[in-house]
From Swiss-Prot:
Part of the 50S ribosomal subunit. It comes from Pyrobaculum islandicum (strain DSM 4184 / JCM 9189 / GEO3). This is Large ribosomal subunit protein uL1. GO terms for cellular component: large ribosomal subunit. Pfam families: Ribosomal_L1 (PF00687). Belongs to the universal ribosomal protein uL1 family. GO terms for biological process: regulation of translation; translation. Gene3D superfamilies: 3.30.190.20, 3.40.50.790.
Length: 222
């Protein structure tokens, strides 16, 4: 990635974003916005939905499991934040408010394959557009490793516009840690959309702060 991105320029933009804005009474997140160009989102292969594990996550994500039977026990032992049983899933049917609340309450969800048809019917219409559909855990998967990975990951999506928006840190983290988080995301994007051809610009901002712009000409190594 160092051959594509000028890390010194990007680090200076991160530091500027951290300085910008008034102090708040809460710990602000640091957000990354990547604007791409010449990406045809009418082509299904360009509409991506990726999980990227951060080297320095700002805080552990909350992970819930839709579970029953042996999978419920495995999920509990893996340290999920909540278990949602089959009966609870069925009780959600038609209750859009409760489903929306659940989608906001947790960052990621997991489920065994046999629950996916039920989940698709009950929560799919609300979870799907939000990118919150559960990660399917096959019978041979290491549930604990999956949960630990999700607790450190962010979702990178391209759906209706060629823009990626993702939380990459908090204002209390070192700029160098935030830089490393951003670089792994840019690496994933570069594999699919070579940034020398497709990057329009990068914006970095705190939750309530003004964005700092890094234009492609500034941040790309030519």
């Amino acid at each position: 990635m160092s051959a594509v991105i000028n890390k010194e320029v990007l680090l200076s933009k991160i530091k500027e974003a951290l300085r910008n804005g008034k102090p708040r009474r809460f710990r602000q997140s640091v957000e990354l916005i990547v604007v791409l160009r010449d990406v045809d989102l009418n082509k299904p292969e360009n509409r991506i939905n990726l999980l990227v594990e951060l080297p320095h996550p700002p805080k552990p994500n909350k992970v819930a499991a839709f579970a029953h039977g042996a999978f419920e026990t495995q999920a509990k032992n893996a340290g999920v934040d909540a278990i949602i049983t089959r009966d609870q899933i069925e009780s959600l049917a038609g209750n859009k408010r409760a489903i929306r609340k659940l989608a906001k309450q947790y960052d990621f969800f997991i489920a065994p394959p046999d629950l996916m048809p039920l989940l698709g019917r009950v929560i799919g219409p609300i979870f799907g557009p939000r990118g919150k559909m559960p990660e399917v855990a096959p019978p041979n998967v290491d549930i604990k490793a999956l949960v630990e990975r999700l607790k450190r990951s962010v979702r990178v999506r391209l759906r209706n516009e060629a823009v990626v928006k993702v939380r990459v840190g908090s204002e209390t983290q070192k700029p160098e840690e935030i830089l490393e988080n951003i670089l792994v995301i840019l690496e994933e994007l570069n594999r699919r959309f070579p940034l020398r051809q497709h990057l329009r610009g990068i914006y970095i901002k705190k939750t309530m702060g003004p964005p700092v712009v890094a234009r492609a000409l500034e941040v790309l190594v030519r």
